[in-house]
Amino acid sequence: MTMAPIHVCFSSDEAYAQHLAVAIASILHHRAQEDELVFSVLDGGISEENRRAIAAMTAAGEASIRFLHVDSAIFENAPIQTVQGGVSHVTLATYYRLLLPSLLPGVGRIIYLDCDLVCRASLAPLFAVDMQGSWVMGVEDIDAARHTERLGLERYVCAGVLLLDLAAWRRNGVEKRCLDFIRDHRDRIVLHDQDVLNVVCQEHLSYLERTWDAQACNTRQGRVSGFNALAKTANIVHFIGGRKPWHPG
């Protein structure tokens, strides 16, 4: 029996290229023998040198990769700084995932991953999850209670690990809905594309098991919520927030 390709997507610019490489390497290291991995990178300005290095590493891991240029001008009016004064680790590349239906017209389902994570298991079980009609699946955000109250929602996922039904997105015009929301409700957006996805897809959004996005952070809510403890055994460890493991101190 031939296994379907597992489509995996990242967004990155040059600043996050090294972290992209680590994330891909972790997936390759933990792949099952039968996994056919197809990587797509939404490229916001990765250098030719780094593209070649990442492509060579991926090929050595018997997977394929493509870099797709994205015109960041599409999101020139999208907010990057939050009302709290700014999130320095976020760039416009975070919004690129909203364009996936048109950037990857032949792909029906995809796993979207942030670059600030490591994978510790095969992605095949995640890719095979029964979405039961959902357009978006993700793990409940570590601070979901605050964000659901802020936006008037029932559910709120972390956008760092997503299972997306791109075929459903195309049928329902989700890409356009997201762009329209950015244009018309800019003042409501604090957490960038994550807010946009949760609002636009709220009625067609459901939760993944926590093991697929253990949101490890150096904050009190991280310790209290149990996400940091989960990170010791999780399939994916996601280093959320502004303080990353590679930062000094």
Predicted regions mapped to residue ranges:
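Glycosyltransferase catalytic domains, chiefly GT-A lineage
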Residues: 1-249
